[in-house]
Amino acid sequence: ASGGIAQSFRLDVSSEENVKNCLDSIAEEMGEIDILINNAGTTTVGLLDQTDSEDWDMVMNTNLRGPWFLAKQWVSRRKEKNLTGGNILNISSINGEAPQKGNGVYCVSKAGLTHLTRQMAIECARYGIRVNTLSPGYMRTDINKEFLDSETGKDFIKRVPMRRYGTPDEMTGPVLLLVSDAGSYITGSTLIVDGGHLLSTL
C-alpha cells in the first residue's frame, strides 16, 4: 500500500520463547500488531500408520502449536496493555475439512487449527478480538506449477468443479473481508475458497 512499511523478522513458530521474543522485537520497532495472520505450514507424505513420530511432531509443531503460540502470546500482550479489538486469521486448508489419503498428518493438523479458531473466538470475543479461518483449495504458485502442469496435475483438476486452480490474487478479497471492518461481525467462522472442490471428493 502507498506509504506502507514492510519489514521481516526471523521466527521459529515451534518455539514459544522465540515467538515471544519476536513479538517483543516487532513491538519495539513497529508497535503492537493489530492483525495476526498465521500462515506458516509444512507437510509430510504417507499413511498415518507408517508415519514416524518425528514427522508427526514436525508438522504439528509448525501447523498447530505454532499458531497457538503466536495467538496465545499476541492475545496476552493485548490484555496486558488494555488494547481492545484486533484480528487473528488462521490459514488452514480444505484438507482440514476432509481427509486425503497419504496426507493424514497435514489433514489432522489443519482440522485442529480450524477448531483452535473456534475455541479462541469464544474466549476472545469479549475483548473485541475476532478469530477466523481461511481455508483455501489448491492454488497455482511458483512452488507447485510444475506439478499442476504435469499430466497428473491436469487430471487432478477434473475434481475441481470450476475446472481450474486458484491464484494467490484470489485470496486478497477473502483475507480483507475477514480482517477488516467489512467483516466486523464475523468471528469463529471458516471461509472456504476452493472453486467448489469440497463439493466433490478430494
PLM features per residue range, with description:
Residues 98, 176, 187-202:
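Short C-terminal tail/terminal secondary-structure segment
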Residues 125, 130, 186-188:
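Short, small/polar-rich loop/turn modules that mediate ligand/substrate recognition or access, typified
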